[in-house]
Design a protein with these regions (language model features):
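Charged, low-complexity intrinsically disordered terminal segments
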Residues: 1-273
Length: 273
């Protein structure tokens, strides 16, 4: 490992990769707006993996919500997309949670999603995580050509704007107004999308009886590819041809090799600082 090549697959990452385009989405208002636009354009498949996927969440607020052609509430949006295009496949994989988090999350999530969406939307709760652990990968892959990844879930008490006002009429959760919240997601295209698409399918296959839709081989994820059709309109690429890697934490589970890639990556980055 050198300063010019910090990524070492099998040690501090699962795979090293490249992103054709990358844009950071700072704070949830920007992330949800970009996500809404990308979902509205989807034609092939949508994979949503998260700590939570709450059907009640409004992705848009204010004038964006008033002027949108597609529904703002995420369950309505996915139902609209699934009905608009019966051939699209949508997969929702949420952590099954523990009793400690029941008050923070939507009750009977799998049944709620199944009631609110048509049959081409499939929902699973991941209960393979050992007791005491949780599922913290927050990944959305759209048409196998675009990926959102980072720290934000589609969950209650997440939405906020960049200015973080002390009080906000729009910053309301099930229990009323909540305090400002800062977080970051990013949207990427290029070869890294195929890596994320492989990862989310592996996650799905571990808990579901059905196999997910095959990877869309015609998706242009090369380093010379044009901006994908599903790229969110109001968020132009900020970086091009970025070296990156996927680092995971995998606990001891049946028939799965554990991994401490995130820990190792952080230590390697600190050592090279």
């Amino acid at each position: 490992m050198t300063k010019n090549n910090i990524f070492t697959p099998g040690e501090n990452c699962w795979v090293s990769s490249e992103a054709r385009y990358v844009t950071p989405l700072i704070d949830c208002a920007n992330y949800y707006k970009a996500l809404h636009n990308a979902i509205s354009k989807a034609q092939h498949s949508i994979f949503i993996v998260g700590w939570d996927i709450d059907s009640r969440i409004r992705l848009l607020r204010g004038k964006d919500e008033e002027n949108a052609e597609a529904p703002s509430v995420v369950s309505d949006l996915l139902a609209w997309k699934a009905e608009q295009n019966p051939d699209i496949k949508i997969y929702l994989l949420r952590w099954d949670s523990s009793l400690a988090f029941f008050a923070q999350r939507e009750m009977w999530a799998k049944e709620v999603w199944e009631e609110k969406t048509p049959d081409n939307v499939e929902t699973q709760l991941d209960d393979t995580i050992p007791m005491g652990g949780s599922q913290h990968q927050k990944i959305i892959v759209v048409d196998d050509e675009l990926v959102f990844s980072g720290g934000m879930d589609i969950s209650t008490n997440r939405w906020d704007t960049r200015d973080h006002p002390v009080q906000s009429e729009e910053r309301q959760g099930p229990d009323g107004e909540y305090p400002p919240l800062h977080d970051v997601q990013m949207v990427s295209s290029g070869p890294v999308v195929k890596d994320f698409a492989t990862l989310v399918r592996w996650r799905w296959e571990r808990v579901a009886d059905s196999e997910p839709i095959a990877l869309r081989e015609e998706a242009d994820t090369g380093l010379t590819a044009a901006k994908p059709r599903t790229w969110p309109d109001d968020f132009p690429p900020e970086f091009e041809n970025v070296s990156c890697a996927l680092a995971r934490t995998i606990p001891f589970m049946d028939e799965v090799e554990p991994a401490q890639e995130v820990r190792t990556m952080l230590l390697d980055l600190i050592n090279q600082a």
